[in-house]
Amino acid sequence: MRTDGHPVADPMNIVFAVDRGYLRQVAVTIRSIVENCSTPESIRFYIVHAEDEAFVAEAIAEWSVSGVTPVRVANDYGTVGGQTHVSKAAFIKSMLPEALSHLDRAIYLDADIILLGDARQLWEVDLKGAAMAGVVDLGVYIQMIRGITLGDFRRRDCQIMLGLDPEKLEYVNSGMMLMDLNQLRAMGFSERFRQTDETYRGRLIFVDQDIINSLLRGRMMLLDSRWNVHSTLMSRHLARRYHYLPDSLRGDLALQQSEQWAIHYTGGRKPWNSSEVWSGEKWWRYAELSGMDWPRPTAAKWSIAQAISEGWFDVASRLSAFRYNLRKVKSG
């Protein structure tokens, strides 16, 4: 019992899977979680990694938070050939059920996420028998439908190859997942992940995310879209392509635009390497509280050529939207 007479909340497990390139960023994510959680004293953080143990322990010692447990695994997955947006560390996600064999349930987060909502509310979501829960990846559907419109069927065909139905609009982003670890162990998730990777290696687009969606087909619960809002989706670039988003997902986009419970800094531009990231200042708020020394990137200077390019992209996007909507009217 707490000294104020209120019962202590059930322990809450939050997990990260990183390499040394993203280890420092975990401190910022953790600080955002602690600052916005109604029961911060109940959180147990785990960092699953394949790095030198002394290096990780030394890094964690600098952080302004406690209750962080490093767990080392052997990551013998090969490099992700040709997939610059996917690191080898992404495969550590597949090892979580076995690496954390003493846990029944966990929230998994990528290290380029900040939590603005109460993690306790996410933790207490009823999975209703599902083995995992995540947020539909709106960006994937925008890019897939745009690709189909332009004659590029790779994203659609990748889903079909894995036994997924692109029409169901249930493909989730693997950067934030609520996991029933008992169910994942029971289904042999880690070994089946490895087998699927061996079968399709070099043929997948989002690799670990593709495999997770394939293995959890029919066992994945969809969460409120505000739990995983992508910075790239809110950027000027992708905003000009919203017309490709299926009508049934537009309500999810509206929710994300109105409120964010978690911001996921997707894409190559991150708050720590670019001053032109949507809601980047929110990340910096928690960076300043993390105990880490973060140098801010300098503001980019726009050239005339960039302004012209941006203007042309805007015109081209408007024309694209007009043609796409006209095609929908004719086909309807």
Walk through the language-model features, giving the residues of each.
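Short, flexible, basic/aromatic active-site loop/helix in glycosyltransferases
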Residues: 153-168
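Active-site-proximal specificity loops/subdomain of glycosyltransferases
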Residues: 55-99
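Short, charged/polar "capping" segments at the starts of alpha-helices
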Residues: 51-58, 142-143
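A glycosyltransferase accessory/donor-loop signature
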Residues: 1-12, 18, 174, 179-332
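Short internal beta-strands
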Residues: 43-51, 134-136
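Active-site beta-to-alpha loop of glycosyltransferases that engages the nucleotide-sugar donor
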Residues: 18-24
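GT-A fold catalytic core of metal-dependent nucleotide-sugar glycosyltransferases
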Residues: 74, 89-150, 178-179, 185-186
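Short, acidic, metal-binding catalytic loop of nucleotide-sugar glycosyltransferases
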Residues: 32-41
